[in-house]
């Protein structure tokens, strides 16, 4: 069973940077050693946003984007190696999620697409890469997402305490770690995605730092109710979603009924949408004693305060409180999934994704010996 240093690379739906984590992993423990966040050039970020909202590309443009993202991920890995004075030979493998540009796990031909050419990463780092983690689960009838509940269970499950782990990235997803029950998990809906899209269009800022804009506004209750009527929120698990559904176009369709509103009020309403949809799912899933929050949304004081208010019987903390940085959780999970793939161990949980069976995930892109 392979053990040693692994690197996890995550570029999520929030597009706030490439998260890279270095960890030692074996069958007994996962120990984070270092991490960094690598910026995504504005032009590349916009190209990804465009394709996620259905803008048509030529095959040449799509191929260029795939290559550019692969090179970006490699640059991020090499920066971490340089910072830690490590060589390629010191790393067992890289687990790279890739950049999701489309996720459609239902219908006649279910599919999900993560790009960022793994061959570019191998060629530019000299390290074996494990990637393309989601499509095997979809081939077995699953949603292909979320995959992190298996990691949350391995690290954070408790024998007697009802726990849930909430990742608030672009999309928010919930892991249900309930003693005596199969692990559960699904996407609750938008996390930071709509808030980020709104402030980017209205104020040219990548995100609402410390929720300053949202806290300056007031929740527009009719708009909130209008958005909450979306059928996704009442859809039973297993379910997953992404930017191809909850995007700026989705927000515009709801705002058509509310002309002339204060942009800060919209920001406040979007924050409340995220908090309400999460808290409703926590309660519908039977509630928990402790909700551990990670992802960019864990740094949003308004979201954290609203979750605590909406879940009065629950201790709401960040995963930092149990020794895992909320900023690095997902990248760390994909380092762990790479370890499981190389060890020949399954990485999905059918109780979460709805797949017909457990399976080894991903494709291996070996480095030259």
Swiss-Prot record:
EC class:
transferase
Superkingdom field: Bacteria
* Pathway(s): Amino-sugar metabolism; 1,6-anhydro-N-acetylmuramate degradation; Cell wall biogenesis; peptidoglycan recycling
Show the GO MF annotations: ATP binding; kinase activity; phosphotransferase activity, alcohol group as acceptor
Enzyme Commission number(s) of this protein: 2.7.1.170
InterPro entries in UniProt: Anhydro_N_Ac-Mur_kinase, ATPase_NBD
Q: Which GO terms describe its biological process?
A: 1,6-anhydro-N-acetyl-beta-muramic acid catabolic process; amino sugar metabolic process; peptidoglycan turnover
What is a single Pfam family found in this protein's UniProt entry? AnmK
Q: Which reaction does it catalyse?
A: 1,6-anhydro-N-acetyl-beta-muramate + ATP + H2O = N-acetyl-D-muramate 6-phosphate + ADP + H(+)
Keyword Transit peptide part of the UniProt annotation: no
Write out the function statement from the record. Catalyzes the specific phosphorylation of 1,6-anhydro-N-acetylmuramic acid (anhMurNAc) with the simultaneous cleavage of the 1,6-anhydro ring, generating MurNAc-6-P. Is required for the utilization of anhMurNAc either imported from the medium or derived from its own cell wall murein, and thus plays a role in cell wall recycling.
Cited HAMAP family: AnhMurNAc_kinase
By sequence similarity, the record places it as follows: Belongs to the anhydro-N-acetylmuramic acid kinase family.
PANTHER family reported in the protein's UniProt record? ANHYDRO-N-ACETYLMURAMIC ACID KINASE
Q: Could you tell me what this protein is called?
A: Anhydro-N-acetylmuramic acid kinase
List the source organism: Shigella boydii serotype 18 (strain CDC 3083-94 / BS512)
What are the leading ranks of the lineage? Bacteria, Pseudomonadati, Pseudomonadota, Gammaproteobacteria, Enterobacterales
Q: Which gene encodes it?
A: anmK
């Amino acid at each position: 069973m392979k053990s040693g240093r692994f690197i996890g690379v995550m570029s999520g739906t929030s597009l706030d940077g490439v998260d890279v984590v270095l960890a030692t992993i074996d069958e007994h423990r996962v120990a984070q050693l270092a991490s960094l966040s690598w910026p995504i050039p504005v032009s590349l970020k916009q190209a990804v946003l465009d394709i996620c909202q259905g803008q048509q590309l030529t095959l040449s443009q799509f191929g260029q984007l795939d290559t550019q993202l692969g090179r970006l991920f490699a640059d991020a890995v090499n920066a971490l190696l340089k910072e830690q004075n490590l060589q390629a030979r010191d790393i067992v493998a890289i687990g790279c999620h890739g950049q999701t540009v489309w996720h459609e796990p239902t219908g006649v031909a279910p599919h999900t697409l993560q790009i960022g050419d793994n061959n570019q990463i191998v060629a530019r780092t000299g390290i074996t890469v494990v990637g393309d983690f989601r499509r095997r689960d979809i081939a077995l009838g699953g949603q292909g997402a979320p995959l992190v509940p298996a990691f949350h269970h391995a690290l954070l499950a408790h024998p007697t305490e009802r726990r849930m782990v909430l990742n608030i990235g672009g999309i928010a997803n919930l892991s249900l770690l309930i003693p005596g029950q199969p692990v559960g998990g699904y996407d609750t809906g938008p996390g930071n995605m709509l808030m980020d899209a709104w402030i980017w269009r209205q104020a040219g800022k990548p995100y609402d730092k410390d929720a300053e804009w949202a806290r300056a506004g007031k929740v527009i209750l009719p708009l909130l109710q209008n958005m909450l009527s979306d059928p996704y929120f009442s859809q039973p698990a297993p379910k997953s979603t992404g930017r191809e559904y909850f995007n700026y176009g989705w927000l515009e369709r709801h705002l058509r009924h509310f002309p002339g509103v204060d942009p800060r009020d919209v920001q406040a309403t979007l924050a409340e949408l995220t908090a309400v949809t999460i808290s409703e799912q926590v309660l519908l899933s039977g509630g928990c004693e402790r909700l551990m929050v990670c992802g960019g949304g864990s740094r949003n004081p308004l979201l954290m305060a609203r979750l605590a208010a909406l879940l009065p019987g629950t201790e709401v903390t960040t995963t930092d409180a149990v020794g895992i940085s909320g900023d690095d959780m997902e990248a760390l999970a994909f380092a762990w999934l790479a370890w499981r793939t190389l060890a020949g161990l399954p990485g999905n949980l059918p109780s979460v994704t709805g797949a017909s069976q457990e399976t080894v995930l991903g494709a291996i892109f070996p480095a030259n010996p």
